[in-house]
Amino acid sequence: MDNNNEMNLSEATEALCTAESVVESMDEMIKLFGVFDENLKVISAETGARIIAAGDCIRIEGSAEAAELAKTVVDKLLITVRRGENVDRSRIRYAVDLAKEGNADLITELESDVVAFTAKGRRIKCKTLGQKKYVNALKRNTVVFGVG
């Protein structure tokens, strides 16, 4: 019976994968991780990977699939942080959903298109693919009906 336990432990160890992302500054890490590492906890929970800050690196551990998913999400969210955008729970969950569907590139594409500016100069951007499709339809067509 001890041999079975040893084999299970070694199989589990072999299945563990690691990935790393490099952070340019501590400010980026703080903005990405959020208050009391709340964002980090959401990314971990949504991807199933363990995320550890080590100096200027973010080390990601988990199964090959979980580690790759978490790395993709972290890298895309770092681009968001570098653009000066805020990262919150809903944005993280949406980014994870897009990455799971294989549409990780759309995470940064959504944020690049400014729809309008407020009176105070803040940018209004699409937050979901549905909003982006709607705005593109408004730009292309004379009449657009929105339901819902």
Residue ranges and their predicted role:
Residues 52-111:
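Interdomain "pre-motor" coupling segment immediately N-terminal to P-loop NTPase/helicase cores
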Residues 6-17, 111-113:
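Flexible hinge/switch segments at interdomain interfaces of large molecular machines
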Residues 45-47, 54:
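N-terminal assembly/transducer modules of large multi-domain enzymes
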Residues 11-31:
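Short glycine-/aliphatic-rich beta-strand segments at the starts of folded cytosolic domains
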Residues 28-45:
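Short amphipathic alpha-helix segments
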Residues 2-3:
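Extended, non-globular interaction scaffolds
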Residues 102-147:
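Pre-Walker A segment
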